[in-house]
Amino acid sequence: MKKDLEGKIILLTGGASGIGRECAIAYVREGAKVAILDRNFEEAKRTVKELGSQSCSYQADVSEPKGIETAVAAILKDFGRLDAVHNNAGIVGPSCPLHETTEEQWDQLQSTNLKSVYWTTKFVFPALVESKGAILNTASMVGLLGQQDHAAYVATKGGMISLTKAMAADYAKYQIRVNAVCPAGAWTPMLEQWAADQPNPAGIREYLDHIHLLGYCPRGDVIADAAAFLLSSKARFITGCILPVSGGAELGYKR
């Protein structure tokens, strides 16, 4: 039986660890070849080694356009084409209200989480036109609902959600689909570190279980399964979709 992503070439940013790593595993499992782009090259190489010959790693910081441009050129040279891009790289930023956020923190969040989508799209667009490909963005439920003491981060994810819809409208004429997944929470190294840095780590874990109506905070593989679906031909008539992968958190969300 043919796999859902058989023969697809997927560029995945932030694929070395966390949700990105789980997505890389899912894409390879479904038959894709994955080009992992990450600033942590050593971690990316370890992930590629685990995945085998169906993946390659490329070093770039998504907040720096030159690195993205160079990596995209290398990927196209190595693979010959590109069928999908998953903009997954991101950072969480400070736990404070907007007026306490420094300009440096604001700019870094915007560059990494949101402006990076602009740069990847700019450099991969011709290849996606040729392949009639797909773009997937990793957003967040907080981009839809807001969250206390995370205004700068929320702004980037809210912007990504609106951008996803606008891109879907712009690129439909090229048969390029654009969608987003919205986790509420998922245990990753980044979230583990964030939780550990809070005044009450045990309380944070209880909170993260509580906000999901299904009763637990998942691992990244549940996000990866949804992402693999949205990049597959099974989702061929889905574009502009902001898909909650949230265990129903939006139905009873507590800030």
Indicate where each model-derived feature is located:
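Residue(s) in the substrate-gating loop at a strand-loop-helix junction
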Residues: 140
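Short, small/polar-rich loop/turn modules that mediate ligand/substrate recognition or access, typified
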Residues: 172, 177, 238-240
